[in-house]
Structures are given as structure tokens and as C-alpha cells.
């Protein structure tokens, strides 16, 4: 069934005008952006298939090639989907600009959407000023965290250049289990020793998962 064959009261655009965006399903909202379907498949059905296959959460980080595996999604529609989720990420980033960090949860919320590939471990350094506001976010390494591979010089080089008052280490666990490994503890100890020498405070090391985080400082390990 084509969108034009829907009861006028049930068409996504008309319902949005009448009842607001909150009254629409994710598939209907996406359908308004993509506008047209194919000869045999209306755009609402296409969007329902997209969300059923990948989930709304995964759509935010999916590639153009993966999107085009769904019937009815070509280059133009795939680019529209990528663009709308990228705008949402940038809105989130702009709201967190110069965010003041008061607890590990602040870091967890700040990092939402910033890990480019959650199937791999990423180590970030957050640079803070004297008010504990983030002045820079730096990706230091990608891959399994290992004290033998992480050199303090690489971590603190940018902190010195930025005149950072303090730093916070952040890395993700692809498994979702945020409990620290022995390697995580070794890296933390190594960089804590270096921070004492360089006199740039290591405020915390935070491990993030999909739904929560682990703070070395709040757990008494730093």
C-alpha cells in the first residue's frame, strides 16, 4: 500500500501536523524525512524494516553500505539517514561543550556517541581546566589496553601543550562489562605515577559500557 492510499488521518505528515512529532513512531518520523518508497513498498514499511533489522540505536552508527542492503534504500536515502544521525550527534556535542565534570556519570553522558566503533577498545584523554571543564577530547589509542603499549609521553604531550590543569582517562569495554581488568589497573598505576612527576593531575580513569560506567576514583582505586 502506498502512503497516498492511507487514510488521510493516518498519514505520518498529517498526524505530525495534528498531534505533534511525539505521536509518531520512529519509523514514521524517519519516513517523513525519506519521503518516498518504491513501487511495491511504501516508505513507512521500508523504515519499519530498517529499524527491525538494525534497531534505532545501531542506525546511528551504521555505514552507507549496510543501509543499502535494505530494499528501497539507495545512495540518496542512505546519505539522508547518515546525515540526520550525524546532526543529532553534533547537537549532543555542542550541548556538552565546556561541560563541567563533577562525577563519573557526567563523563559517561558526555561520551555518549563519541566512540566511533564500539566493537574495539578506544582510549580517550579528556583535558580539563581549573574549573574542571572539558577543553579538549583526544583519542589516544585504539585496541586492547596494555600498559606495555601505552606510553605516558603520548598521553601527557597534548596535556602539556593545552596547559591542562588535569586529565581524565576514558576507555570503553566492547563486552559491556565495565569491571576493570588487570591491564586497566596497570595502565592507571603507570599514568598516575607519571602525572605526579609531570604535575598534571589524573583525576580519574573511567570505563564505559552501553548502560553504565566504572570509576577508579569513586571505587577507591585512584
Curated annotation (Swiss-Prot):
GO terms for biological process: proteolysis. It holds the Pfam family RadC. Keywords: Hydrolase, Metal-binding, Metalloprotease, Protease, Zinc. A motif (JAMM motif) lies at residues 171-184. InterPro entries: MPN, RadC_JAB, RuvA_2-like, UPF0758, UPF0758_CS, UPF0758_N. It comes from the Bacteria. Zn(2+) binds at residues 171, 173, 184. Belongs to the UPF0758 family. This is UPF0758 protein Ppha_0935.
Amino acid at each position: 500500500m502506498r502512503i497516498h492510499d492511507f487514510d488521510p488521518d493516518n498519514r505520518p505528515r498529517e498526524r505530525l501536523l495534528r498531534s505533534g512529532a511525539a505521536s509518531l513512531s520512529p519509523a514514521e518520523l524517519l519516513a517523513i524525512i525519506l519521503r518516498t518508497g518504491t513501487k511495491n513498498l511504501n516508505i513507512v514499511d521500508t523504515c519499519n524494516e530498517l529499524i527491525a533489522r538494525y534497531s534505532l540505536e545501531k542506525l546511528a552508527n551504521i555505514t552507507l553500505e549496510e543501509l543499502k542492503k535494505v530494499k528501497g534504500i539507495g545512495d540518496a536515502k542512505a546519505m539522508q539517514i547518515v546525515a540526520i544521525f550525524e546532526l543529532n550527534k553534533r547537537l549532543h556535542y555542542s550541548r556538552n561543550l565546556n561541560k563541567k565534570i563533577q562525577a563519573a556519570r557526567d563523563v559517561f553522558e558526555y561520551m555518549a556517541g563519541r566512540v566511533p566503533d564500539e566493537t574495539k577498545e578506544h582510549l580517550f584523554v579528556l583535558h580539563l581546566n581549573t574549573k574542571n571543564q572539558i577543553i579538549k577530547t583526544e583519542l589516544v589509542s585504539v585496541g586492547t589496553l596494555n600498559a606495555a603499549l601505552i606510553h605516558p609521553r603520548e598521553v601527557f604531550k597534548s596535556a602539556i601543550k593545552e596547559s591542562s590543569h588535569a586529565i581524565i582517562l576514558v576507555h570503553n569495554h566492547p563486552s559491556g562489562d565495565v569491571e576493570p581488568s588487570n591491564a586497566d589497573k596497570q595502565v592507571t598505576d603507570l599514568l598516575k605515577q607519571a602525572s605526579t612527576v609531570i604535575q598534571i593531575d589524573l583525576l580519574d580513569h573511567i570505563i564505559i559500557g552501553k548502560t553504565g560506567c566504572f570509576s577508579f576514583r569513586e571505587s577507591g582505586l585512584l
